[in-house]
Curated annotation (Swiss-Prot):
Entry keywords, A to Z: ATP-binding, Chaperone, Cytoplasm, Isomerase, Nucleotide-binding, Stress response
Compartments in which it is found: Cytoplasm
Gene: groEL
Family: Belongs to the chaperonin (HSP60) family.
Organism classification: Bacteria, Bacillati, Bacillota, Bacilli, Bacillales
Assembly and binders: Forms a cylinder of 14 subunits composed of two heptameric rings stacked back-to-back. Interacts with the co-chaperonin GroES.
NCBIfam families: GroEL (TIGR02348), PRK00013.1 (NF000592), PRK12849.1 (NF009487), PRK12850.1 (NF009488), PRK12851.1 (NF009489)
Species for this entry: Bacillus sp. (strain PS3)
Protein name: Chaperonin GroEL
E.C. number(s) listed in UniProt: 5.6.1.7
Length: 538
């Protein structure tokens, strides 16, 4: 296919038009008085959202050169979302400001490479300063503030704070759609995995359709068990203790399963069998986690352990196990706290090293199950459109809260960026590098300016006053008052602000140093001239 090429100023201007179109659509959502954007969907009702990255991903422009610029800024939002989970609109606003200011200077004859070095120098200082003024997050109230600011909803803030308090900072918090109108929290204590009972004959509570085992022993193996002879040594010892047994195995079938069911129906012995969770290496890791949590051992021939020589000392224990048709929950496992802590630290180390998103998700799940539990926020709303919008906001709030726990918080509403203004301005640089520093200085004013404009105020006046205010004092666009932002609960996670600034600078530097753009040439419509004559057809 033939290509079309644009060079230097013409190429950069075309990209800037695309940057502006995307950024202008995204930045109307910034701040407490930001508006929503309606996105057309090919199927179903339109999506109404104020989530920057969702809007950015939807935008596709007709002009291929403009589209390149738009896609580069969408990349800023996407990357910030991947790292921090929030702050995508801020990142877009920063990128637009840097690109716009940078191109003005390049058009006036500045060297793009010099500007790039200046931008990188300024951002490095800005990031260090943001970390220096960051405050660690303390207690449930601070967590609620971060979540409430991100979701623009006090109730959501309280819900997320309660979820994190219940399952701990390493716990898994997931979102589900509720059947009703209200948004509520459901917490699963202990370790839960997605495997239920095989036979309904194992149920102990017919009303709830679940098998509840009080103070059971837990046999953990990766084997397929078909002969009762293999299980007998362990079964006899458990029966003598008069306690129930949970068997977690690859499968229990034939004679072994029949014997367990018959004994349960006769009331002589209560044993519930569930399939081992996961597959392959992941199954081995999960069985090992269950063993550590319950103080048992994985009976595996790979490890030189055989079922027929299993003693009661190799079995795990828990205060309670609840088995439903689809899940098994182990509450208060009797594992050694030192072993559990060591396993948690090992998973954390693996999390730092992994580059796969899938592996990261699975490691996070394992960590949560060992560390405390799983919380489910069931999101409710009156209509499907509102439900989607609410779910996106809660997801952002959740990510924002995790980022705050990780790297602390700073003053919100763009105030943290304004508080580092003087430190960045003090950087010693000359020529085009100094121009790069000035571009970053102008860009870090932009979030405050945009928040004020979205609230119907003159942004420049707010920016000028902020430059002379004490650190931490900022403008509350929701009430129109000047307040201590952290005391007022208007906070932003440092990780979110830092990521937004770094990603915006990275893409801005790429656009400024672009000298040519290559795109596909649109095909001309050749019409139907070569169609054969259809004769007398109607």
């Amino acid at each position: 296919m033939a290509k079309q090429i644009k060079f230097s100023e013409e190429a950069r201007r075309a990209m800037l038009r695309g940057v502006d179109k995307l950024a202008d659509a995204v930045k109307v959502t910034l701040g407490p008085k930001g508006r929503n954007v309606v996105l057309e969907k090919k199927f179903g009702s339109p999506l109404i959202t104020n989530d920057g990255v969702t809007i950015a991903k939807e935008i596709e422009l007709e002009d291929p050169f403009e589209n390149m610029g738009a896609k580069l800024v969408a990349e800023v939002a996407s990357k910030t979302n991947d790292i921090a989970g929030d702050g995508t609109t801020t990142a877009t606003v920063l990128a637009q400001a840097m690109i716009r200011e940078g191109l003005k200077n390049v058009a006036a004859g500045a060297n793009p490479m010099g500007i790039r070095r200046g931008i990188e120098k300024a951002v490095a200082v800005a990031v260090e300063e943001l970390k220096a003024i960051s405050k660690p997050i303390k207690g449930k109230e601070s967590i609620a503030q971060v979540a409430a600011i991100s979701a623009a909803d006090e109730e959501v803030g309280q819900l997320i704070a309660e979820a994190m308090e219940r399952v701990g900072n390493d716990g898994v918090i997931t979102l589900e759609e509720s059947k009703g109108f209200t948004t509520e929290l459901d917490v699963v204590e202990g370790m839960q995995f997605d495997r239920g009972y095989v036979s309904p004959n194992m149920i102990t509570d017919t009303e709830k359709m679940e098998a509840v085992l009080e103070n059971p022993y837990i046999l953990i193996t990766d084997k397929k068990v078909s002969s009762i002879q293999e299980l007998l040594p362990a079964l006899e010892q458990v029966v003598q203790q008069g306690r129930p047994l949970l068997i977690i195995a690859e499968d229990v079938e034939g004679e072994a399963l029949a014997t367990l069911v018959v004994n349960k129906l006769r009331g002589t012995f209560n044993a519930v069998r569930v399939k081992a969770p996961g597959f392959g290496d992941r199954r081995k890791a999960m069985l090992e986690d269950i063993a550590i949590l319950t103080g048992g051992e994985v009976i595996s021939e790979e490890l030189g352990r055989e079922l027929k020589s299993t003693t009661i000392a190799s079995l795990g224990r828990a205060s309670k196990v609840v088995v439903t048709k689809e899940t098994t929950t182990i509450v208060e496992g009797a594992g050694d706290s030192k072993r559990i802590k060591a396993a948690i630290n090992q998973i954390r180390a693996q999390l730092k090293e992994t580059t796969s998103e899938f592996d990261r998700e699975k490691l996070q799940e394992r960590l949560a199950k060992l560390a405390g539990g799983v919380a489910v926020i069931k999101v409710g709303a009156a209509t499907e459109t509102e439900l989607k919008e609410r779910k996106l906001r809660i997801e952002d709030a959740l990510n924002s809260t995790r980022a705050a726990v990780e790297e602390g918080i700073g003053a919100g509403g763009g105030t943290a960026l304004m508080n580092i203004h003087n430190k960045v301005a003090a950087i010693e640089a000359e020529g085009d590098e100094a121009t790069g520093v000035k571009i970053v200085l102008r860009a870090i004013e932009e979030p405050v300016r945009q928040i004020a404009q979205n609230a119907g105020l003159e942004g420049s006046i707010i920016v000028e006053r902020l430059k002379n205010e004490k650190p931490g004092i900022g403008f509350n666009a929701a009430t129109g008052e000047w307040v201590d932002m952290i005391e007022a609960g208007i906070v932003d996670p440092t990780k979110v602000t830092r990521s937004a600034l770094q990603n915006a600078a990275s893409v801005a530097a790429m656009v400024l140093t672009t000298e040519a753009c290559v795109a596909d040439k649109p095909e001309e419509n050749k019409g139907n001239n070569n169609m054969p004559d259809m004769g007398g057809m109607m």
